[in-house]
Design a protein with these regions (language model features):
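Predominant activation on well-ordered alpha-helical scaffold segments within soluble catalytic domains
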Residues: 32, 80-83, 87, 110, ...
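Small/polar glycine-rich anion-binding or flexible loop at a beta-alpha turn
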Residues: 245-249, 271, 302
Length: 302
């Protein structure tokens, strides 16, 4: 792999700017027959909580025009399984590891981050789209003061760089980015899914049991690119951009809008080779454009 693809994110060097979006790549094991995990900049795990979460009732997924809705409910086996099973597997394959963390309270997040402080993990991604059960169910990422507070709490105990995953379901995402930057975040990732709904007109009911779900896929990309651009012009910390990335051109849009790294999500479901193909495509682009480094295009659109 060309050294020209290397990027620095929050003080860490990644061989290329491509990772996986949490929840779309399992723990890496599920895709290992399609992708050499050490070829990716990093593997981002599915969200992990302090205890196993059962997830939402089924049906939990519905196809939509240009994407999909999901209401999995962050089902996961918990931090013990991640440490005992998933991390050793990723280490065997020389993958850089970003662990996505979820929780129902500030204490939940802190507990997981404290456990991970003892592990060989490269970076943490904190999912603040989770509902805060102690604040009436509002997501941590929907109020700036809550986002700043949770950022400060996890930064106090974290041993790895911390990036905060921002929800697009807010009035002004730049205010959320500024809040987590003030809380000490080392970076931000965006966007998480947009809230959507689909109705089954034949059954005259909701297409998914949870009624609403997170919308992802190509349909959200223009919103995601716009938000990445806005955040890049509002904060000084680096951005992991995501939302509808299917191919190299999509990834380039995010980089030019101001993202330092990109994450591929829904595309993994219909093309398990997507991440690997994008790495190859970026390498070809750098050579074709005669760039000395992929970083030359980051934020080039003003």
């Amino acid at each position: 792999m060309s050294e020209k693809l290397a990027v620095n994110f929050a003080g860490l060097t990644f061989e290329n700017p491509v990772t996986t979006a949490s929840g779309t790549f399992g723990s890496g094991l599920e895709y290992s027959e399609f992708v050499n995990l050490d070829k990716l900049g990093a593997v981002t795990t599915k969200g992990v909580a302090n205890v196993p979460w059962p997830g939402n009732p089924t049906p939990r997924i519905a196809e939509t025009h240009g994407g999909m809705l999901n209401a999995i409910g962050l089902q996961n086996p918990g931090i013990d399984t991640l440490i005992a099973r998933d991390l050793p597997y990723l280490h065997e394959r020389n993958a850089k590891i970003i662990v996505n963390v979820c929780g129902r309270s500030k204490e939940d997040y802190v507990e997981v981050v404290e456990r991970l402080a003892q592990e060989d993990v490269d970076m943490l991604e904190i999912n603040i789209s989770c509902p805060n059960v102690k604040a009436g169910g509002i997501a941590f990422g929907q109020k700036p003061e809550m986002a700043e507070d949770i950022t400060k709490a996890v930064k106090k105990v974290a041993k790895q760089p911390v990036i905060m995953k921002l929800s697009p379901n807010v009035t002004d995402i730049t205010e959320m980015a500024k809040a987590v930057e003030a809380g000490g975040a080392d970076g931000v990732s965006l966007i998480n899914t947009l809230t959507g709904m689909k109705i089954d007109v034949n059954r005259k009911t909701f297409a998914i049991a949870n009624q609403t779900g997170g919308m992802s896929g190509p349909c959200v990309k223009p919103v995601a690119v716009r938000m990445v651009y806005q955040v890049a012009n509002a904060v000084q910390i680096p951005i992991l951009g995501m939302g509808g990335i299917q191919n190299t051109e999509d990834a380039l849009e995010f980089l030019m809008a101001g993202a330092t790294m990109v994450a591929v999500g829904t595309a993994n479901f219909f093309n398990p080779y997507a991440t690997s193909e994008i790495v190859d495509g970026l390498e070809a682009y750098v050579e074709r454009e005669k760039l000395s480094s992929i970083t030359e295009i980051i934020g080039c659109v003003k």
